[in-house]
C-alpha cells in the first residue's frame, strides 16, 4: 500500500524566502508522526506546504501514491487531507452543529467508502461538543473551540489529518481531555496523523514516530518511544540550532 504521505527533497517557503530545505519523510497509512522543534524552525510551514499554502520550490509531495505538489488547496482537501491550523478558524456566528455539518463530505475522491464521520461519532469523541451543540462558535471556550476545529476536520472524512499545536494555550484539564481523545482517535480510526506540538513529551506519548526540525531541516527521525525514554537527548535535539 502507498504511504499516506511522502515528501522527498522538499524545498519551500514564502515567495523567494526559502524556509524548508531538503525535507524528506514518510507517514504510512494509520501512522502517526510528531513534529517537534523550537519556534521558528519550520514546523508550521511544513504543514502549510503539505496543504498548498506556501511557495513550492523543489521536491515532491505524494499523498496515497499521487503527487500533489501542483494541486490547489481545495483539491488536496478533496483527496482526503484534513487540516487543523493554529487559531482554530471556526465560524464564530454558526452553532457548533452547523460548524460540523457544513464540513461534512459524503465520499472521497480516492475511492474509499462514503461517510465514516458523522455528528454522532464526533459527539462520541468529544462529549462536550454534544452539550454545546446549539451554542455559537464564539460562545464556547478555547478548549471547546479546539475540539470543534478537530471535529470539523474529521467531518471531511480525511485519510491524513494535520494538526498544528492543538494543545497551545489550553488549561491542563482540557489538555488531558484532548490527549485522551487523540489517543482514542489514533487507536480506533483508519487515518494517519501529523501532529506539530510544542509540548514534546505529550506529543511523543500519542504518536509512533517523531521528527525533529532545526532551521528548516530534519535533524532526527525515529520512534517516539525512544525519544520519550531519553529526555536528555530529546532536550538536546529540541534546542538544537
Each language-model region and where it sits:
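Catalytic Walker B motif of ABC-type/P-loop ATPase nucleotide-binding domains
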Residues: 161-165
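Conserved ABC transporter NBD signature motif
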Residues: 59-68, 79, 113-119
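The feature captures the beta-strand-to-loop junction immediately N-terminal to the Walker
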Residues: 36-38
Amino acid at each position: 500500500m502507498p504511504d499516506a504521505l511522502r515528501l522527498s527533497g522538499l524545498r519551500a517557503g514564502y515567495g523567494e524566502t526559502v524556509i524548508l530545505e531538503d525535507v524528506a519523510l514518510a507517514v504510512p497509512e494509520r501512522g502517526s508522526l510528531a513534529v517537534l522543534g523550537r519556534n521558528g524552525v519550520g514546523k508550521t510551514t511544513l504543514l502549510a506546504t503539505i496543504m498548498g499554502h506556501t511557495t513550492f520550490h523543489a521536491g515532491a509531495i505524494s499523498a496515497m501514491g499521487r503527487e500533489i505538489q501542483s494541486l490547489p488547496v481545495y483539491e488536496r482537501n478533496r483527496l482526503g487531507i484534513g487540516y487543523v491550523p493554529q487559531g482554530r478558524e471556526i465560524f464564530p456566528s454558526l452553532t457548533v452543529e452547523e460548524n460540523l455539518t457544513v464540513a461534512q463530505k459524503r465520499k472521497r475522491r480516492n475511492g474509499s467508502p462514503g461517510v465514516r464521520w458523522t455528528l454522532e461519532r464526533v459527539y462520541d469523541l468529544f462529549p462536550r461538543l454534544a452539550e454545546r451543540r446549539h451554542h455559537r462558535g464564539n460562545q464556547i471556550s478555547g478548549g471547546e473551540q479546539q475540539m470543534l476545529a478537530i471535529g470539523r476536520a474529521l467531518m471531511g472524512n480525511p485519510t491524513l489529518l494535520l494538526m498544528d499545536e492543538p494543545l497551545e494555550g489550553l488549561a491542563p484539564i482540557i489538555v488531558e481531555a484532548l490527549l485522551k481523545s487523540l489517543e482514542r482517535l489514533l487507536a480506533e480510526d483508519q487515518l494517519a496523523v501529523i501532529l506539530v506540538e510544542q509540548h514534546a513529551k505529550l506529543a511523543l506519548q500519542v504518536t509512533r514516530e517523531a521528527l525533529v526540525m532545526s532551521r528548516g531541516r530534519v535533524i532526527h527521525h525515529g520512534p517516539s518511544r525512544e525519544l520519550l525514554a531519553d529526555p536528555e537527548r530529546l532536550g538536546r535535539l529540541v534546542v538544537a540550532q
